[in-house]
Amino acid sequence: MTKKIFTLFAFLLLFSCSDSEPIAPSETVDYTAKNEQEIKEYLTKNNITTAQRTDSGLYYTISEQGTGTNPTVSSNVTVAYKGYLTNGQVFDQSTTAGVAFPLSNLIKGWQEGIPFFKPGGKGVLFIPAHLGYGGRPQGPIPAGSVIIFEIHLISVN
């Protein structure tokens, strides 16, 4: 019995002497200004002069208009896409046949940007972190990253 009490006491003493501090909740970082600058620099470096900016900070270009009705946030859409960072690192890509999604289940950048396209339309979305994955990393996408998507809206289902 004494041996068990001594072992328990030694165990408690060992862990009570730890010098590690409790982990604080992660701070919220505002990437808005940094992302705005990063997008502008990317557009300039790549000689993209037709990009439009929305009030939220999303930039987009439309290279092919497409025809038909624009989707809404409540639409199901089939989209072929390629997603990459401003350094060119591709993090996701669909087949040319595209992938069907309920637009309401996607990141805010897609919810806002895809409705600019008509079926058959093509273009690019330049999405700041607050409309993408925010301050948390998502697989190969670092926290606070601008993400770029080449978009081909195949259909509105």
Which residue stretches match the model-derived regions?
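Cross-family detector of peptidyl-prolyl cis-trans isomerase
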Residues: T2-F9, C17-N157
